[in-house]
């Protein structure tokens, strides 16, 4: 492996948080190195249309937005490397990162490796991702106006997605593998009010067995009720499926280095700056690796900006 030159700061990840951190770090003359990771561009690369990015009132695709961020970071001379980090050493300085192709050292790190949605694990899911299967109602819900769709999940996220979608879709089939929801009572109460209107149809103790469709996208779901002894499956017609069964942060390689909670990196927070610092000085985190609540492109970008500013202050303190 070739040993790369030492860098003041390395940014891991090429989603909104990573690119924003790169832009701010570059403008601060820190000459950052951004390592893209496996999924260049992050989750937005699977989003067909974005209508809630401030200033872009005309439709823009996820890949288009990420390409613009990529070009923006290059404008300010960010060095971008296509590699995937497989192990790190943060317990001594300089920090050491081992990639699939090269080795890297640096004085500061911003972790923006993102989080991937947890899917059902059906073989038919990959076929319809971006063509009827979504993991973000706020991002894609509007495109199902006056259509019948399904939501799968039983926690806060699933119910929140259902409540949001109920504002403009025709009907929602909410599918949950258990008999009871694992969500806040206030959310369940709101859900049950809508259930009474028959706009939301509950399928409890049920699982999705298969996803059917054509070249245009999803058309039907096959679901099975676990309480029924017969093996017959119910076929329901839907235009889309929103999967809301949780997220998996891309933080496995940091588990023995950083403090975490449920796979998400814990940061300092507070009101006196250094908000994005982890338990190790010089290691900062931004985007979906620290956020299991909002998970929006704009909130990821905001935290990427904060991490860049925090890391700049840290590096200045070393000189």
Curated annotation (Swiss-Prot):
<dbReference type="GO" id="GO:0004791">
    <property type="term" value="F:thioredoxin-disulfide reductase (NADPH) activity"/>
</dbReference>
<dbReference type="GO" id="GO:0019430">
    <property type="term" value="P:removal of superoxide radicals"/>
</dbReference>
<feature type="binding site">
    <location>
        <begin position="36"/>
        <end position="43"/>
    </location>
    <ligand>
        <name>FAD</name>
    </ligand>
</feature>
<dbReference type="InterPro" id="IPR005982">
    <property type="entry name" value="Thioredox_Rdtase"/>
</dbReference>
<feature type="disulfide bond" description="Redox-active">
    <location>
        <begin position="136"/>
        <end position="139"/>
    </location>
</feature>
<comment type="similarity">
    <text>Belongs to the class-II pyridine nucleotide-disulfide oxidoreductase family.</text>
</comment>
<dbReference type="InterPro" id="IPR023753">
    <property type="entry name" value="FAD/NAD-binding_dom"/>
</dbReference>
<keyword id="KW-0676">Redox-active center</keyword>
<feature type="binding site">
    <location>
        <begin position="288"/>
        <end position="297"/>
    </location>
    <ligand>
        <name>FAD</name>
    </ligand>
</feature>
<dbReference type="InterPro" id="IPR050097">
    <property type="entry name" value="Ferredoxin-NADP_redctase_2"/>
</dbReference>
<dbReference type="GO" id="GO:0005737">
    <property type="term" value="C:cytoplasm"/>
</dbReference>
<keyword id="KW-0274">FAD</keyword>
<protein>
    <recommendedName>
        <fullName>Thioredoxin reductase</fullName>
        <ecNumber>1.8.1.9</ecNumber>
    </recommendedName>
</protein>
<comment type="subunit">
    <text>Homodimer.</text>
</comment>
<dbReference type="Pfam" id="PF07992">
    <property type="entry name" value="Pyr_redox_2"/>
</dbReference>
<keyword id="KW-0963">Cytoplasm</keyword>
<keyword id="KW-0285">Flavoprotein</keyword>
<dbReference type="InterPro" id="IPR008255">
    <property type="entry name" value="Pyr_nucl-diS_OxRdtase_2_AS"/>
</dbReference>
<keyword id="KW-1015">Disulfide bond</keyword>
<dbReference type="InterPro" id="IPR036188">
    <property type="entry name" value="FAD/NAD-bd_sf"/>
</dbReference>
<keyword id="KW-0521">NADP</keyword>
<keyword id="KW-0560">Oxidoreductase</keyword>
């Amino acid at each position: 492996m070739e040993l790369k030159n030492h860098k003041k700061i390395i940014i891991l990840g090429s989603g909104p948080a990573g690119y924003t951190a790169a832009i701010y770090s570059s403008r601060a003359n820190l000459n950052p190195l951004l390592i893209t990771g496996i999924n260049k561009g992050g989750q937005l690369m699977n989003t067909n249309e974005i209508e809630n990015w401030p200033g872009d009132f005309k439709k823009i695709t996820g890949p288009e937005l990420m390409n613009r961020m990529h070009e923006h970071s290059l404008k300010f001379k960010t060095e971008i490397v296509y590699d995937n980090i497989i192990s790190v050493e943060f317990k001594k300085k300089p920090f050491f990162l081992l990639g699939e192709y090269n080795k890297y050292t640096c004085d500061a790190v911003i972790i923006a490796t993102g989080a991937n949605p947890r899917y059902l694990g059906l073989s038919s899911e990959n076929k319809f991702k971006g063509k009827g299967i979504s993991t973000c109602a706020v991002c894609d819900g509007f495109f199902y106006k006056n259509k019948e769709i399904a939501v799968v999940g039983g926690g806060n996220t699933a119910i929140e997605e259902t409540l949001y979608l109920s504002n403009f879709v025709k009907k929602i089939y909410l599918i949950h593998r258990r008999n009871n929801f694992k969500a806040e009572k206030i959310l369940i109460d709101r859900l049950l009010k809508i259930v009474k209107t028959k706009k939301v149809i509950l399928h409890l103790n049920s699982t999705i067995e298969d996803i059917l469709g054509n070249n245009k996208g999803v058309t039907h779901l096959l679901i099975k009720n676990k309480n029924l002894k017969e093996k017959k499956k119910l076929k329901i017609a839907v235009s889309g499926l929103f999967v809301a069964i949780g997220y998996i942060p891309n933080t496995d390689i940091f588990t023995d280095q950083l403090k975490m909670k449920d796979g998400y990196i814990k940061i300092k927070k507070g009101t006196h700056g250094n908000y994005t610092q982890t338990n190790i000085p010089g290691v900062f985190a931004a985007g979906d690796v620290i956020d299991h609540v909002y998970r929006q492109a704009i909130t990821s970008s905001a935290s990427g900006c904060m991490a860049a500013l925090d890391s700049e202050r840290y590096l200045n303190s070393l000189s």
